Amino acid sequence: MLRWIVWRDLMLAWRRRADMLSTVFFFVIVVSLFPLGIGPETQLLRTIAPGVVWVAALLASMLSLGRLFANDYQDGTLEQLLLTPQPLFLVVLGKILAHWIVAEVPLVLIAPLVGVQFDLSRETLWILFVSLLIGTPVLSLIGSVGAALTLGLRGGGVLISILVLPLYIPALIFGAGAVEASVMGTSPSAHLSLLGAFAIVSLLFSPWATAAALRISLE
């Protein structure tokens, strides 16, 4: 069931490639605006790079959260999935995994390329990649709860932002902190460990919370 959900959502996302590309373009544009606006101040660029890239990734991931369950809700597929004998949290976990692959993995892969604009070293670019690889699943996991709670509501995109942005703060602090530690020449292992722990906690609780929120929204 989990594999089928992931494959189905990936195929649907491939048919709507423009949505995926818009997320990537938004991320690239937001990150690229800062070097253009600040100019060739390499030390300043290296200082602000961790926060800029992580905030851009956070905002870009939110662009697609509203579509996480909306399409299946509108065509009735979500209600049919709710009636299947399979546990709902498996359906939710499959959709979260597909969302991460479609919306977050491209950002993780392209982040080191846009990070070059900030004059980051190879080691720091690697830490940037690793921090996003560990941290972006958190964005999809926590974001799914907000998407489920606001399902079918008018102005749901704004409500999702209000609900999930405060919960993203630990991931932002630990992820950007790991990159900043690398920029400063210190070990990022503590920040990466905390980010990994936060990701594990999110994985344990978010699918269940999202499944419960979907049941409430569909009643």
What are the residue ranges of the model-derived segments?
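Transmembrane helix boundary and interhelical loop/hinge segments in multi-pass membrane proteins
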Residues: 62-82, 96
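Membrane-interfacial helix-loop-helix connectors in multipass membrane proteins
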Residues: 37-48, 112-133, 151, 178-194, ...
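A structural motif at transmembrane helix-loop-helix junctions in multipass membrane proteins
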Residues: 126, 133-165, 215-219
